[in-house]
Amino acid sequence: MNNFSRRSFALGAAAATTLAACGNGIGSAGAATIDARVDSTLNAMYAAFPGTLDLAARANGILVIPLVTEVGLGFGGSFGRGALRVGPSTVDYYAAASGSAGLQIGAQQFSHVLFFMTPEALSEFRRSQGWAAGADIEYAFSSRSDMLRAETTTSLSPVIAVVFGQTGLRLGATLEGTKYTRIIP
């Protein structure tokens, strides 16, 4: 009753391949959308935190994740997409994702920017298959523009993370453990 011929297999494989090709993001407006959001996020950050202009000028590269959405209720997770800029040019696109379990509740959205202050830190990030944010990052969380000043811009840390634009409330939120993976939008 289950007579599966080579012709049926070939037709099924061709249909699956055709269907898979329909979802290919190459040639879509995904990259342009991410770049526009990155530009908007950088302009908002520079306006709200003028001290980050000096930080950006000294950085070897900047990873901008314009919108990260975090949700947690016992188990939690976050996701966002952004671009790595070296100078004024976008060189790669990345997804940031994390998962967690434990005492947490709520949802929030925020923007974050990673400043790679040394060539080694940028090179390690770009070479890795999936880079995880850890203890070697200096975090600058701020809701007031006057608090993000000299202590951040004179830091000797190889990577500085600026987190801003938080909306919502989530207990137990952090960037630590976030994994960054290169994508093709």
Task: Tell me what each language-model feature is.
Residues 23-185:
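Small-residue-enriched, tightly packed secondary-structure blocks
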